[in-house]
Amino acid sequence: MTIGSAPSLSTRRFAAFGGVHLVGDVGGDARGASVILLHGGGQTRHSWGAATSALAARGYYIVALDLRGHGDSEWAPDANYGIDAQIGDMHAVIREMPSPPVLVGASMGGLVSLTTTGESAPHLVRALVLVDVTPRVDPAGRARIIGFMRDRPGGFASIEEAADAVAAYLPHRPRPKDLTGLRRNLRQRASGRWYWHLGPEIF
């Protein structure tokens, strides 16, 4: 495979902590260095966009994972989304990797990566990459995020309405013209309305 080619990714289910099954996009060379990508809270594995395919094209073995309760991964039947359950999930996925992985985590995924690395035997994790993670959590910032995610219990009438809500929440960022990424973080229910694609107890 040459750099710049577009490797195919397959979707895989992982049996994780407490009987919950996680879903990830998997691809690349199993003989190469292993990398697990973990998204932020309220997002999905698709948040990594083209990075997943780009890393696979460069010879890495990639797993872009939906955390429990997010995306296509199962919701915890006991609503257990605590850090111990997340670490248990990561240990289950790491056991399925062909080599000790590099954990790359953004925001909440970074905290899961960090605590997993700290709670694991040294040989289980090769390296740690943190994106948008701080040493301390700002209570006001956390409350703002939770408030935004809970603000629309009735969902959105359209993807465009969801995009308007995100743009109002993040006025310093330009509203994207391509809403494909946002679409992957939403699911349309039988009512026709769009909802965040995550377990209701997460926020």
Q: What are the language-model segments listed below?
A:
Residues 25-74:
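Conserved HGGG/HGGXW glycine-rich cap/lid loop of the alpha/beta-hydrolase fold
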Residues 1-14, 25:
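An N-terminal hydrophobic leader/cap segment in hydrolases
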Residues 134-159:
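A catalytic-pocket lid/entrance helix-loop region that shapes and gates access to the active site
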Residues 84-101:
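Conserved acidic catalytic loop of the alpha/beta-hydrolase fold
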Residues 157-203:
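Conserved alpha/beta-hydrolase catalytic His-Asp/Glu region
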Residues 98-139:
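Conserved hydrolase catalytic core segment
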Residues 17-27:
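A short loop-to-beta-strand scaffold at the N-terminal edge of the catalytic core in hydrolase folds
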